[in-house]
Swiss-Prot record:
Disulfide bonds: none annotated. The keyword Signal does not apply. One of its GO terms (cellular component) is ribosome. Gene3D superfamilies: 1.10.287.3980. GO terms for biological process: translation. This is Large ribosomal subunit protein bL34. GO terms for molecular function: structural constituent of ribosome. The lineage of its organism: Bacteria, Bacillati, Actinomycetota, Actinomycetes, Mycobacteriales. Belongs to the bacterial ribosomal protein bL34 family. The keyword Ribosomal protein applies. InterPro entries: Ribosomal_bL34, Ribosomal_bL34_CS.
Length: 47
């Protein structure tokens, strides 16, 4: 049975534009995400 193509096609520029720090800082919800991750002690805050 055929599976189809792989759906994850890595692209660093797209990754940064969709999940990056600058994008997170744009909205109130995004800023809260970053602050939550800071409080939790995450090593990486955003993509």
């Amino acid at each position: 049975m055929a599976k189809g193509k792989r759906t994850f096609q890595p692209n660093n520029r797209r990754r940064a534009r969709v999940h990056g720090f600058r994008l997170r800082m744009r909205t109130r919800a995004g800023r809260s995400i970053v602050s939550d991750r800071r409080r939790k002690g995450r090593r990486t805050l955003t993509a």
